[in-house]
């Protein structure tokens, strides 16, 4: 259901082990300040909205995604962001290498008219950067 809703809009999908909620909040604040009213789906409550989700009036969606169970691979992406990658959720991914491969798949879903943004300072992201198209 979420994937279908998001597919109807231009979207920014934020992934990573840490900083997803903060990054999603910052981007949504920038859009709102710029008078672009995005739909926002966040993992934490946004102080400016008093909620973790908000239906906007523009054709933009800013979404915090969840890599813990691989479901972030099911969400359509226009612009992808990965903040960092740590050895988390290995109960699902089984190893750090498999987790990193999931992030490569996520980033490589970004269409040619979109853009991917990564934190190259993060050692795990740096180690996969040559696999990102």
What are these regions (language model features)?
Residues 1-133:
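Phosphate-binding loop of NTP-binding sites
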């Amino acid at each position: 259901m979420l994937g279908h809703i998001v597919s109807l809009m231009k979207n920014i999908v934020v992934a990573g082990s840490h900083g997803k909620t903060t990054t999603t909040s910052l981007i949504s604040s920038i859009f709102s300040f710029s008078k672009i009213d995005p739909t926002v789906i966040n993992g934490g409550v946004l102080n400016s909205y008093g909620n973790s989700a908000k239906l906007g009036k523009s054709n933009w969606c800013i979404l915090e995604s969840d890599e813990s169970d691989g479901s972030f691979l099911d969400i359509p992406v226009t612009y992808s962001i990965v903040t960092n990658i740590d050895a988390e959720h290995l109960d699902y991914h089984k190893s750090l290498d498999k987790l990193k491969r999931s992030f490569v798949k996520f980033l490589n879903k970004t269409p040619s008219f979109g853009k991917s943004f990564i934190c190259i300072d993060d050692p795990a992201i740096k180690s996969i950067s040559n696999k990102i198209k």
